[in-house]
């Protein structure tokens, strides 16, 4: 079940992309930030409020198979690039896929420290870069 919200001249569809994307036609590019794996969700905390780790994420995590389905839906909707910030374990599932182009990293300018203080905090987010193959690859006007 999806919900449509209008924001000015934009339409935001709140729903499962595996159900919604096939109804929208094709796009030049899909940029997405799907939910991460269960371990990431379980460990995600904020120190706002009481000064100690409070659960931060209130939506469901994706299994590896769920992530595969989400990326398949994104690739099906894209005539070219699919760029996803994702759990590194999910990204690794695509390393040998024909659509795989590259892994990137978004380096956090001010990452949250590890609340447990028993290891370093995560300083980056994995960026999975795929291409549907429906048109030739071109990035940054050929650069």
List each language-model region with its residue ranges.
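Core catalytic lobe of class I
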Residues: 5-143
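Short, acidic/polar N-cap/turn motifs at the starts of alpha helices
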Residues: 1-2
